[in-house]
Amino acid sequence: MAFLKKSLFLVLFLGLVSLSIGEEEKREEEEKNEEGANQEENAENKEKRFIGTLIPLALGALTKLFKG
């Protein structure tokens, strides 16, 4: 009976260890995905800021061209 009890505890312990390792890997993968999404958002924001500064400059140049 003691042999079965030890075997059961060993199986439960190994299952718990593998479960915790899987959860850790899943959490790391989610963090990597979030970082990638944040980098894409930053690139989009930079592009929007560039276009936002480019439009007034272009309008200013066009008004000078037509006035001039």
From Swiss-Prot:
Biased composition (Acidic residues): 26-42
Renumbered residue ranges of the record's region Disordered: 23-45
Pfam families assigned to the protein according to its UniProt record, in alphabetical order: FSAP_sig_propep
Lysine amide PTM positions: K67
Positions of the propeptide segment: 23-47
Cysteines paired by S-S bonds: none
InterPro entries documented for this protein: Frog_antimicrobial_propeptide
Tissues where the protein occurs: Expressed by the skin glands.
CC annotations in GO: extracellular region
Keywords carried by this UniProt record: Amidation, Amphibian defense peptide, Antibiotic, Antimicrobial, Cleavage on pair of basic residues, Cytolysis, Hemolysis, Immunity, Innate immunity, Secreted, Signal
Domain of life, per lineage: Eukaryota
Record-level GO BP terms: defense response to Gram-negative bacterium; defense response to Gram-positive bacterium; defense response to protozoan; hemolysis in another organism; innate immune response
Entry's family note: Belongs to the frog skin active peptide (FSAP) family.
Name of protein: Figainin 1
Organismal lineage: Eukaryota, Metazoa, Chordata, Craniata, Vertebrata
